[in-house]
Amino acid sequence: MRRHSETDVEEQTQELKTITQLQEQCRALQIQGVKENMDQNKATLALLRSNIRRGAQDWALAKKYDQWTISKACGKNLPLRLAHCRSTMEVVREKLRKYVFDRVNMHNLLIHLVRRRGQKLESMQLELDSLRSQPDASKEELRLLQIIRQLENNIEKTMIKIITSQNIHLLYLDLLDYLKTVLAGYPIELDKLQNLVVNYCSELSDMKIMSQDAMMITDEVKRNMRQREASFIEERRARENRLNQQKKLIDKIHTKETSEKYRRGQMDLDFPSNLMSTETLKLRRKETSTAEMEYQSGVTAVVEKVKSAVRCSHVWDITSRFLAQRNTEENLELQMEDCEEWRVQLKALVKQLELEEAVLKFRQKPSSISFKSVEKKMTDMLKEEEERLQLAHSNMTKGQELLLTIQMGIDNLYVRLMGINLPATQREVVLSNTLDLNSKLAYCEGKLTYLADRVQMVSRTEEGDTKVRDTLESSTLMEKYNTRISFENREEDMIDTFQFPDMDHSYVPSRAEIKRQAQRLIEGKLKAAKKKKK
């Protein structure tokens, strides 16, 4: 059995040795394979790094070339170059293509507009040449043209009048509606005023009640403050008396202790050890024991009194109780200061309430008469504003009519003076593109001054005067405003028609007198209103 077991063990060891050898060979092969893989990876890494470096150089070169091409494409346009410096070549190419396409479209549009304007200019030039080639118009045509211009001016003026009248009518309707709404809102305002008066009366009664309550509260606070102050003073005095008594007792105890210690020390020093007998020692011991007992009983009595006064059960609580009493005393002093400040504030509040009570007491209560007077004043003011509005409307219509008549007269004068040519020496006023009233007036002024100078230079004759009068009468014969006035009784017109029954009726007051009378009337009304309020 032993041999068999030894052989088995040897076989197992042989197998294990072979296994370990195989494992070592496998490990060596694995290490060799790993080294080969590492060498291959290093070679690939070097190749990849060189490729990356080459790619980076190519990319930098391509980027530089793109920037060069972009700057060359943008030219001297610095904003465009800065806008596209960070973009890629494809994006810049697309943007530049779009920009060039837009510019080409704009160029084509401008060329088209230039061609159209050239065609229009040619047509207008042809029309101008045709108009220049036409013969001069006859007098009848000029007269018809003048009539047409007058009719156009009249139509424009009537249209302006119609528009202004419509605007005035709309403004009148708006003002009427606004005044109606305002008038409808007056009863609500009066109700609000009545409610305010009622609220003021209720607030006045509440303020009176509040002032009475505040006065009662202040009296109660004053009474409580006096009581608390008196009780606090009594407590403070009692506490001080107790503390003084306790301090005196403690001082007595300390003095007794010190004197007893001193006496004992002296006795120990003076005592002769050789001569002292046992009897004297016993007697002295008895005396000292009785004295100590009396002293201890006195001290315990004093301590008990202090405990009962301070209300504590232990001796070591006495100091803390004294400190607590000191803190309470300080707190009470602070509370007294706060109460004093509160008392001052309450006094100020009472004074303010008394003043408000006096103001409200002597204030007049509102009545229905004041409301009626306010309503009457408001209606009078409304009527005055309506009258002012009507007056402003009438003045505005008069002003518009006057302006229209002036414009019509200036237009007619301008049309009539257009045919008069000024001499070469006198400079003609250059008219603006928009013929406004001022330019027309300046034009007419130049022509009229020239005509006035010519009239002064020409000598007047009766034949010329009659011709002018006849032409004026014939030209204004069919006008509406040209009415005949009959002067039948010329002598009666010279008679004074101001027949007054009395000289007082013929008196017309001056402006200062009217102002004085108005001031007197206003002062009288104000005095009457003040008397009613009182």
Curated annotation (Swiss-Prot):
Task: Name the InterPro entries on file.
Answer: CCDC183
Question: What are the record keywords, sorted?
Answer: Coiled coil
Q: Coiled-coil regions in this chain?
A: 10-54, 136-209, 323-396
State the signal peptide span: none
**The protein's name:** Coiled-coil domain-containing protein 183
Q: Gene behind this chain?
A: CCDC183
Where on the tree of life does the source sit, at the highest rank?
A: Eukaryota
